[in-house]
Regions:
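Extended, well-structured beta-strand/loop surface patches
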Residues: 59, 71-73
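Blade-loop segments of beta-propeller domains
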Residues: 76
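Beta-propeller domains
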Residues: 61-63
Length: 294
């Protein structure tokens, strides 16, 4: 088909993306996008069919504020089938942060990976993660199916709201965090007749908890320098847990492990988990999807 990397107007992009020809040429159904980690090396793959070029940048930390303003490694990606750019890097990269420098529509944009599973503080940079190391104890047994609920009772929960109050009975360091769901026998002001948090959910008898967005969203500063609140309908990284709910937002594996612990705690209580996700918009115009494929 025609050259899809040339500069276009928004209307021309819309026409191109809507065409059957583009879909047939570039639709990609593989499951290897993002950073596929192994101890001996990591494969990076980015779907960006309209990009002229893509470069992989590796960093020692998740943000410039942590002393890693410049990448320690840059690698030109190879354009392969269906507009997928690929890089293979040897060695154990677990815990290394990365971005893509994408040249598309006449502009260069440094962006996080739309397919990343972990990220540094505020989602600025993606992180290579060994998902096995981020498993809480017993996670491998969490795949067992729960009994079917005859009459579903769904309770909506905001991770921060769930335990933020000082009278919640949750330890101070875990209030408003994923780990609050793992605390047992919590009650109001020490009065066991007034259960809170997980004890309250079990007392209610709910069968499902629908969690307001717990993917990485942009309207709350994860550093915690100031008190902020949002429902979370401002997505930045769809496959990365929100860092403000983690006890450590700077190291990407922590949010993954603690989010899993939350889900595990709910399952152990016999409660299914529903994720609330919004796909019709993102936090800002300069987002990981638009920076990758304008």
């Amino acid at each position: 088909m025609e050259n899809v990397t040339q500069k276009r107007t928004p209307g021309e992009w819309r026409e191109l993306f809507s065409s059957q020809e583009f879909e047939e040429a570039y639709e990609y159904g593989g499951d290897d996008l993002g950073a596929v980690y192994q101890t001996q090396g990591t494969d990076f793959a980015l779907w960006a069919p309209t990009a002229e070029r893509a470069e992989l940048l590796l960093y020692r930390a998740g943000s410039a504020e942590e002393g890693a303003a410049e990448p320690f490694d840059r690698t030109e990606a190879v354009r392969t089938e269906k507009g997928v750019f690929r890089v293979h890097k040897n060695g154990d990269l677990s815990g290394v942060y990365y971005t893509w420098l994408v040249t598309a529509n006449g502009q260069k944009q440094e962006t996080a990976d739309p397919y990343a599973k972990a990220a540094g503080v505020n989602g600025q940079r993606s992180m290579v993660i060994d998902l096995k190391k981020a498993e809480p104890e017993g996670w491998d047994k969490d795949q067992e199916k729960l009994p079917k609920a005859p009459a579903p009772v769904v309770w909506e929960v905001h991770v921060g709201d769930f335990s933020h109050d000082p009278q919640s009975g949750v330890s101070e360091e875990n209030r408003g965090k994923y780990k609050a769901f793992s605390e047992k026998d919590t009650c109001l002001d020490g009065n066991t007749e007034n259960p809170t948090c997980m004890s309250w959910l079990k007392w209610l008898g709910v069968t499902h908890v629908q969690i307001l967005p717990m993917y990485d969203y942009g309207s709350v500063d994860e550093t915690g320098k100031k008190l902020q609140y949002n429902w979370g309908y401002d997505p930045m990284n769809y496959f990365v847990p929100e860092g403000s709910y983690a006890t450590d937002p700077y190291h990407g594996e922590v949010r993954v492990r603690e989010c899993r612990e939350m889900i595990q705690a709910l399952h152990r209580a016999g409660i299914r988990v529903i994720m609330d996700v919004v796909y019709n918009h993102m936090y800002r115009y300069e987002n990981v999807l638009n920076n990758t494929v304008p």
